Amino acid sequence: MAEQTEKAFLKQPKVFLSSKKSGKGKRPGKGGNRFWKNIGLGFKTPREAIEGTYIDQKCPFTGTVSIRGRILSGTCHSAKMQRTIIVRRDYLHFVKKYRRYEKRHSNIPAHVSPCFRVKEGDRVTIGQCRPLSKTVRFNVLKVIPAGSSSIGKKAFTGM
């Protein structure tokens, strides 16, 4: 079962837990009762979402949230909140008077499911969903760790 740390009993709404059958339905996750879905748009459902035991209503893979609208990517700027990160998007803005570009950025708060391990500096892909709180309107769909980025400078291979 999931870690019950809240006062209310945490469970997935589409899974019946009081089955009289023995064996298979005892624990969620691998071989047990667990609701998960394919969100489409070319994103694979993480293995942790299928086999894990976490309960998260705002998760796009195991919760009741659908992804629609914009798909954005950026860098994780802050991961200090619980299940929420700040995604920084850098862009260039053209100044007509000087005929040059200036650097600008925007910070977007996004909900991160427990099936992802996100640290500062990781590249993340986020998708728009319904408002999850006062400021959060996006959900993390994919994480690329900071060290394994295929985009960037290649190391010198030698002679």
Swiss-Prot record:
SUPFAM superfamilies hit by this protein: Nucleic acid-binding proteins
Domain of life from the UniProt record: Eukaryota
UniProt-listed InterPro entries: NA-bd_OB-fold, Ribosomal_uS17, Ribosomal_uS17_arc/euk, Ribosomal_uS17_CS, Ribosomal_uS17_N
Molecular function terms from GO: mRNA binding; rRNA binding; structural constituent of ribosome
Xref: PROSITE patterns: RIBOSOMAL_S17 (PS00056)
Major subcellular site: cytoplasm
GO biological process: translation
S-S bridge residues: none
Cited Gene3D superfamilies: 2.40.50.1000
Keywords: Cytoplasm, Ribonucleoprotein, Ribosomal protein, RNA-binding, rRNA-binding
Keyword RNA-binding on entry: yes
A Pfam family per the record: Ribosomal_S17_N
GO cellular component, one term: cytosolic small ribosomal subunit
Subcellular location: Cytoplasm
PANTHER family cross-referenced by the UniProt entry: 40S RIBOSOMAL PROTEIN S11 FAMILY MEMBER, SMALL RIBOSOMAL SUBUNIT PROTEIN US17X-RELATED
Family (UniProt): Belongs to the universal ribosomal protein uS17 family.
Name of the protein: Small ribosomal subunit protein uS17y
Organism in which the protein naturally occurs: Arabidopsis thaliana
Lineage: Eukaryota, Viridiplantae, Streptophyta, Embryophyta, Tracheophyta
Gene that encodes it: RPS11B
